[in-house]
């Protein structure tokens, strides 16, 4: 099932808010539609929104081209549009990474161009490269993650939220590893937290694993402790939306609680994320901006009110797991282990030397 596809002048996105009961697509012909799709979680997952935003910049360049102003002013409009795209989801660093990468490329080549048509062509090529890279690095992450389970069979994995094909341009980050273990005949079952309040685990993770014939058991978030206590979980694998230079990990709300439970039960807690998820400007997770979402996501479920009117609501979209709780970080360049400041620093050297 394709979740992101660029067709001439149109970005086609699988509307993940309709899953699992309806397969519907959003056709974006304007960059604002892309921004709205990201904000409203029609497309979600840190790598996926980075890919979507890079395609959205093509539409932004096309709109700027329609402005009857000098080329320099059209470029200014494009840069302004790009900043708006970046602001749609402040926690997921992949979004800003993709937008900044594309805009930096435009600025590096702008002196050799004289029209927004040329700019749009350049952005199109780069967006396609970003998408293709995501597919490739998902495979490499899956292979790297599988090395953590060499010689083991009947493996039972717990995951939180959705870090699968629906969250990326490829196999997925956490679920890419799961798929590799399944392919190797090592996987017994995946336990998927439903992931309140928007049920990404129930609606998306359980959906895509079931569609692929991978054994999956759905549990409510407050059942994770029970599953661990009963010896049903061998390892936890989650994705990430931002990782600091210390190895602190921002991911979907509830991830921190799962990590604490895993530590208490001596269960390894793995994070799978590409290089683009690392924020080298931040050392501590306390500095990661946490997106706060609307109250109705907590007080209603599928349009049905589940709480009294007028109550206070706390609805952070993410929490931060301290690096001390992370057993290893799985990347496309291999597995990182503590000391994370050293291993993440080496990762940066490897990638930037290419």
Predicted features and spans:
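Long amphipathic alpha-helical segments
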Residues: 2-113
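Short beta-strand segments
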Residues: 14, 52, 96-98, 158-162, ...
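Conserved phosphate- and dinucleotide-binding cores of soluble alpha/beta proteins
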Residues: 195-354
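Histidine-anchored nucleotide/phosphate-binding helix
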Residues: 172-183, 259
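Generic structural signal for well-ordered, non-membrane alpha-helical segments
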Residues: 27, 31-34, 46, 50, ...
């Amino acid at each position: 099932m394709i979740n992101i596809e660029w067709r001439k002048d149109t970005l086609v996105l699988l509307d993940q808010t309709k899953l699992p009961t309806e397969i519907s697509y959003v056709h974006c012909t304007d960059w604002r539609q892309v921004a709205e799709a990201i904000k409203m979680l029609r497309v979600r997952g840190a790598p996926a929104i980075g890919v979507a935003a890079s395609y959205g910049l093509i539409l932004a360049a096309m709109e700027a081209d329609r402005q009857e102003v000098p080329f320099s002013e059209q470029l200014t409009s494009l840069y302004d549009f790009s900043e708006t795209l970046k602001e749609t989801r402040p926690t997921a660093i992949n979004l800003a990474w993709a937008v900044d990468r594309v805009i930096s490329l435009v600025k590096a080549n702008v002196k050799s161009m004289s029209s927004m048509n040329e700019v749009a062509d350049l952005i199109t090529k780069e967006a396609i490269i970003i998408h293709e890279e995501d597919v490739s690095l998902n495979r490499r992450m899956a292979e790297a993650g599988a090395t953590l389970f060499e010689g083991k069979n009947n493996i039972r994995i717990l995951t939180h939220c959705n870090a699968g094909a629906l969250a990326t341009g490829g196999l997925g980050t956490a679920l890419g590893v799961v798929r590799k273990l399944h392919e190797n005949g090592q996987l017994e079952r995946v336990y998927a937290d439903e992931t309140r309040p928007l049920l990404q685990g129930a609606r998306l993770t359980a959906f895509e694993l079931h569609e692929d014939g991978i054994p999956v058991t759905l549990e409510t978030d407050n059942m994770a402790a029970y599953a661990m206590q009963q010896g049903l979980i061998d390892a936890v694998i989650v994705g990430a939306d931002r990782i600091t230079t210390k190895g602190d990990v921002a991911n979907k709300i509830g991830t921190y609680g799962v990590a604490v439970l895993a530590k208490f039960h001596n269960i390894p807690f793995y994070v799978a994320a590409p290089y683009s998820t690392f924020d080298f400007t931040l050392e501590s997770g306390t500095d990661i901006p946490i997106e706060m979402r609307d109250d109705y996501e907590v007080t209603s479920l599928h349009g049905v009110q589940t709480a009294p009117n007028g109550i206070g609501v706390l609805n952070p979209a993410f929490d931060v797991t301290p690096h001390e709780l992370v057993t290893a970080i799985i990347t496309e360049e291999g597995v990182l282990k503590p000391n994370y400041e050293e291993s993440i620093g080496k990762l940066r050297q490897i990638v930037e030397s290419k």
